[in-house]
């Protein structure tokens, strides 16, 4: 599908992240935007018929920051080639930091199954969800019970039975024996997007992945391996460090026998503000959640996500494909401007995303993550598209 879009320039205001006490948390940052337009064209895969339409595009310029990493954006901004129509309206958005969580901090290879009495985050299943798997590139999945403990092999298998319609499944780490459990439970045609979450344990993670692949599948089952999640957006790494992490992982993965794509995952804003990130990944893998733009209603989530794809594509000079590695809508939580959490709105948002750019997007997430804190706006637990509430 071919689209025309407008490049916009805006301002980023980041807030400090609280240090996690036991496990990694999902945190948000506020983003204030002011828009300037410039015409560009980009090709994006969607599920509607081929159409040429104008859409708005935001390129973000960081002006203040609570971290040294984020402040780098002031020297790596995206300049439009043409300026026109200055838009004076502002919008508040924030980004969702999604991460690996386990019952033991720092363990990238935990394999302890949870007890049968542990409550599973998939307890509320797809029975009452009308969202289908068709139309999306894939879905994200985390193997944790409501108390944060690891799901058993049997629990993971039960979860995966509900995900058979998705072509690709994204995992965030290697803890809880998740790679081997998902490899055993997935269908023969499904592919995995794996994650190396702990960048100080890259070789350990690669060893775990290699062992699982050799025991329960082949490297053909793996479509992508990511290194870290939102490191620049979270202020925990510079762009140069991200490049080093990706290089280290590529070398280790190549030695292990893997020849597929290796990427770093960050927010769309982090990439726009730090286009050096475009140099390291085999394609651009970014997270984008329309709920955190207070001016975007659920039914408009798809065009909003498409704009973020085009923004990143432009920031990278049109040289890298863009895949949305997280996008969705919460079913519970606080109303944030036009963004209203509810199951009906979640279904409307997912439908809109699929229609606009579904073949370029991983839906977030399979089941509610009740092991998380409520977080800002009280939405952190309730993104499960196959959960009943």
Swiss-Prot record:
Glycosylated. The keyword Cytoplasm does not apply. It is an enzyme of class 3 (hydrolase). GO terms for biological process: carbohydrate metabolic process; cell wall organization; conjugation with cellular fusion. SUPFAM superfamilies: (Trans)glycosidases. Its EC number is 3.2.1.-. Residues 70-134 are annotated as: Disordered. Belongs to the glycosyl hydrolase 17 family. Glucanases possibly play a role in cell expansion during growth, in cell-cell fusion during mating, and in spore release during sporulation. This is Probable family 17 glucosidase SCW10. It comes from Saccharomyces cerevisiae (strain ATCC 204508 / S288c).
